[in-house]
Amino acid sequence: MSLFGLLLLTSALAGQRQGTQAESNLSSKFQFSSNKEQNGVQDPQHERIITVSTNGSIHSPRFPHTYPRNTVLVWRLVAVEENVWIQLTFDERFGLEDPEDDICKYDFVEVEEPSDGTILGRWCGSGTVPGKQISKGNQIRIRFVSDEYFPSEPGFCIHYNIVMPQFTEAVSPSVLPPSALPLDLLNNAITAFSTLEDLIRYLEPERWQLDLEDLYRPTWQLLGKAFVFGRKSRVVDLNLLTEEVRLYSCTPRNFSVSIREELKRTDTIFWPGCLLVKRCGGNCACCLHNCNECQCVPSKVTKKYHEVLQLRPKTGVRGLHKSLTDVALEHHEECDCVCRGSTGG
C-alpha cells in the first residue's frame, strides 16, 4: 500500500472516532437534560424522596406548559422532624385532562397517605383547584400519571410546608366532617339524599369519584350472595329503590322497613336506610272463619338478599369504611286470614 493511501485511511478512521465521540456526548447531554427536567422518577415502582425542612414545591414536567405524555412520576415528602405534618397547597394554575363520567381515569394527580395507603384525593380537569391536603404524619406521597393521549396545560404545581399539629385550626362542632358525627346523627343526615352520587360526594368531597369507582369495581373475593346465587342482578341502581305501595286485602304488599331495625344493628349505617319488602297487610273483613275477629298473617315466608351501601366507623382512626353488602330480609309470599289468637287457623 502506498504511503498516500495509508495516510488517507488513517485520517478517515480518526474522523469516524471523533464523530462517534461527538454523537455520544450529544446523546449524553440530551439524556441528562431529560432526566433533569422530569422533576421526579419515571419508574412507577420507585419514588423520589424529598426531605422537607422548609417550604418548597413540586410540579408536573414543563409546568406551566403542556406536560409530556406517557409519564408516571412519584414523590414522597418526608419531614425532618417526626412530630409534624406536611400541608399541600395547589397552585391556582391547575389543568389536566378532563375526567370521563366524573372519574379521573387518564391524566391525574393523586395524594396518598403512606402510613396506611389511603388515597386522600385524585384530581384532573380544570374546573376547580383542589383544596389543601394535610398528612396524618410526617410523610405524604404524590403521584402524577399521564397517558398517551390529550396532554393539557398548565399541569399542576403543589406547594408544601411544615404544619405543627398543636397550631392547626380546630374544627368547629357545627362543621364537623360527616365521618366525625355520631352514627345516629349521620344516619339522619344521609336520609336526605336521593342519589348515591350525592351521598358519596357529601361523605368524601375531595375523593368521591374514587370511592364511587371503587364501589362498582368487580372484586371476586367480595362478591355477595345476591351475585353468587343469582337472586338479583349484580348491577343495581341504588337510586331507584322506591316504588308505589299498592293496597290489597290480606295479600303480600309493599312495606318500607328500616334495615337497622330489622337487623338490630346500631353500629352500622345502611343506605338506602329503608327498603321495600313484601309483608302481609290489609284487612280480613270477609273472613270465612267463624270467629269474632280475623287477622292477616303470613303462611309462606322467604328470605331475599338486597345489595346496599354499608358505612362502618374505622377502628382507631377517623373515617368510615364504605362497601356494598347483601342484607337478608324476610318477605311474605302468601297470606291467610285466621282467627285472632288462633294457632290452628
Swiss-Prot record:
Induction field: Up-regulated by EWS-FLI1 chimeric transcription factor in tumor derived cells. Up-regulated in podocytes and interstitial cells after injury/activation of these cells. FGF2 activates PDGFC transcription via EGR1. Up-regulated by TGFB1 in concert with FGF2.
Keywords on record: Cell membrane, Cleavage on pair of basic residues, Cytoplasm, Developmental protein, Disulfide bond, Glycoprotein, Growth factor, Membrane, Mitogen, Nucleus, Secreted, Signal, Ubl conjugation
Residues carrying sugar: 25, 55
Assigned GO CC terms: cell surface; cytosol; endoplasmic reticulum lumen; extracellular exosome; extracellular region; extracellular space; Golgi membrane; nucleus
Signal peptide: 1-22
GO BP: animal organ morphogenesis; bone development; cellular response to amino acid stimulus; central nervous system development; digestive tract development; fibroblast proliferation; platelet-derived growth factor receptor signaling pathway; positive regulation of cell division
Positions of disulphide bridges: 104-124, 250-294, 280-335, 287-337
Site feature: Cleavage: 225-226, 231-232, 234-235
Primary site of residence: cytoplasm
Alphabetized Pfam families for the sequence: CUB (PF00431), PDGF (PF00341)
Protein name: Platelet-derived growth factor C
Organism per entry: Homo sapiens
Taxonomic lineage from the root: Eukaryota, Metazoa, Chordata, Craniata, Vertebrata
